[in-house]
Amino acid sequence: RVCDITYDSIRRCVLKTGHGVKTTHRMPTLREALEVCKDRIVVNVDQGYEYYDLVLAVTEELGVTDQILIKGKRSTDAVAAKFAEHPRNMMYMPIIDILKPQGRALFAEYQEKGIAPLAYEVCWNKYTPEVKECMDKVVAGGSKLWVNSLWASLCGGLDDDAAFGGDPAEVYGKLV
């Protein structure tokens, strides 16, 4: 269980390359990672919404709040309430599991309220007309489309492993 892992044992972990080769780099803290990224890139703090206040405190201290993206499956009202607690906020991107009832309902809520976030992460396990319709609405509404290509189950099999093991243009070409 993750909760049984100590901070010291995590700090002893060595990072690996995408192909599993060990590097000389140790597991950084969030603060260390953000210090390296400052004024360079946008950072997706995955699974970070549950820790929004803690992450925001670190980003504000480091002056990187405008570079941080937090994703989640929260209602528009919940996000608005959380953002109202702070004078400055990180970017928020809704995750839409468009083939699931909760995902369809969340997307409909954003559409009905006329809220156009910077981007939506649209997830699907099989490409269907409903997926295409959602993507078309995202783009037509002025938002960007984010596809999580790390796992096949989030992008209908159009993932990085499929691209690496086959023709990248064939896989990624379907996403752009």
What kind of region is each of these model predictions?
Residues 101-176:
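C-terminal active-site rim and adjoining tail of enzyme catalytic domains
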Residues 48-52, 74-77, 98-99, 125-128, ...:
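Solvent-exposed loop/turn segments at secondary-structure junctions
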